[in-house]
C-alpha cells in the first residue's frame, strides 16, 4: 500500500504587537472560542510542564466548511522560541492525519506569525482532499485575521465575562434535561419566540432561536452546543446580535443540598464600531457593556428560574 499523499500549507500574517502579546493568545486554549471563529469549544485533557516546554492534550470542537468536527490533539509549547507544534492524535474523517506549527518572529514594532499545516486524507480521495484544503484555507485565514485583531486590540474593554446562578431543588439530571431539550423552550420560556434544534451527532446540537430582549426587541441567534451529561452544556453563537463580535457560554450544574446550583456563564466580545449606530451617538462602550450584561443576564436568569418553576412547582 503506497504511503498517503501529504499536503502542506503555509499561512502568514504580520501583527502590530510584540511576540509577548501574541503568543499567549495561541497558547491559552480557553481564549480560542471567543477569539477564533471556527473554534466552538476546547477541553484541556492533560498538561505537563517540562522545563522550557509544556505538553498538552486537548479535545477540540470546531467548524469546517460549516460542519462541526471534533478531534484530539497534542501540543508542545516552547515559549522561548515562539513555537507551538501540534499533531492530531485522533482525527475526524475525511482527515486521516494532521499536524503543524505556529512560529512567531519578532519584527521591528511587531510580530510575524507563520501557521504551517501538513495533512493526509482517508484513501487519498481527491474530493476529500479538496474539502480539507478548503477548510484549512478558510480556517487558517480566519484565525490569523482574528489573532491579529485580538493582539492589536488587547485590553480595550471589549471583552466581558459574567455569570448568574439560581438554586434549583431538583436532581441534576432533571435540570440538565430542561437545558438540553431546547426544542421545548418555545413552550417553556416566555422570552423565546421561535426555536429550531437539530442534533445529527449525539451531544452536538445546532440551536437557532428568536429571543425577546428586555426592551422587546427580537434577536435571531444560531449556536453550536456541545452537551456533557449531566452537568455541563457549552455553546458558541455563530449568528450574533449586531453589537457582538463573539459570544460563548456554559450552563453548569453543581450539586448542593437537595438540588443543584445552576449557573449561566457568558463571555462576549463587543463591537465598539457599532455602539453609536445602535445605541445613539452619545453612547459609550461602558453603556454597551451594561446593556449586554443586563440583556444576556436577564434571559439566562429567566431560563433558570423557569427551570426551577417547572421542576419544583410546589415550592413556587
What are these regions (language model features)?
Residues 12-14, 76, 103, 165-167, ...:
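Generic structural detector for well-ordered beta-strands
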Residues 1-53, 133, 141-201:
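Hydrophobic ligand-binding cavity/cleft-lining segments
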Residues 2-4, 30-34, 43-94, 183-187, ...:
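Glycine-rich portal/gate segments that line the openings of hydrophobic small-molecule binding cavities
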Residues 161-163, 220, 248:
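Transmembrane beta-barrel architecture of outer membranes
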Residues 4, 56-65, 70-72, 87-141, ...:
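Beta-strand/loop substructures that line and gate deep hydrophobic ligand-binding cavities in soluble
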Residues 15, 117-119, 168, 211, ...:
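Hydrophobic beta-strand positions in extracellular immunoglobulin-like domains
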Residues 35, 43-48, 114-116, 126-130, ...:
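Short, tandemly repeated low-complexity microdomains enriched for cysteine and small residues
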Residues 136-144, 148, 296-300, 304:
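N-terminal membrane-insertion helices
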